[in-house]
Amino acid sequence: MFKPFYLLALLGSLLACPVAHAQIFQRELGDFDLKLGTTPTRSMAQGLVKPSAVGSFHGGLDLSHDSGFYFGQWSPSAGISPGKDLEIDTYAGFKQPFDQTLGYEVGLIRYSYPEVTTPASQELFGGLTLLGSRFGIAFSNDPDKQNSTLFADLSGNQPFGVGISLKYTTHQLNTPVSVDGGYVGSFTDWSLKLSRPFMGIDLDLIYSDSNLGGSSCSAYSGHNSQCDGLVTLKAERAFY
């Protein structure tokens, strides 16, 4: 498993590479394509399936082969900022186009937390790419629950330059949680994200909610930052 300092060393060694994007460095190694940066390079394997709270220091690498196989690691938090634990998401998969407009992708992600006792979890995902947009499904086995997710990333069609992504997840708890008036054994949550770059800044407007409310929110442990409806505006700018 790659350590964060090893990722940073690799990143430093590639600073002289041609810039493929403001936050991604890319280099060809024979039949392989290597990418490093502070922006996820695969939306299905990083960020879209199971987004995590991103810390001030984050980044990763992605190695893909002409055959369609790929492997990578993404760390949404390097554990440097106060209150942020080190997280390393390791993934592998296969991606292949049927033609110029349609393709498919399958893969597996492992979420691990080396510096804490939180058990690792796995996620199996698959989806279709149609005219640049992605539609998929994912199944994961967190230590306390099972999750089934439907997602869509409509980046292939951006009205007014705005990217749109949606996610809907059903969570089945391994052990029902006691709340006022009964128990919660399962719940659902969802989110809608609008994204647009503006003067070098990546802007995200996110609406999230769940089917829980009131005292039942004590049982919530889903993807969103809170149980009730929430609107979040996020702005991010690369340092290089």
Predicted regions and their residues:
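Cleavable N-terminal export/targeting peptides
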Residues: M1-D31, F239-Y240
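Short glycine/proline- and aromatic-enriched beta-strand/turn motifs that initiate or cap beta-hairpins
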Residues: H21-A78
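Repeated loop/turn-to-beta-strand initiation elements of outer-membrane beta-barrel proteins
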Residues: F32-L34, S67-Q73, Q100-V106, G132-I137, ...
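Outer-membrane beta-barrel pore domains and translocons
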Residues: G37-T41, W74-A78, K95, I109-Y113, ...
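Solvent-exposed loop/turn segments connecting transmembrane beta-strands
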Residues: Q46-G55, A78-E87, Y111-S121, F139-L150, ...
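Residue-level signature of outer-membrane beta-barrel architecture
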Residues: L61-H65, F94-Q96, L128-L130, I137, ...
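Detector for outer-membrane/organellar transmembrane beta-barrel domains
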Residues: P119-G185
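Outer-membrane beta-barrel "beta-signal"
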Residues: L131, L192-G200, S225-Y240
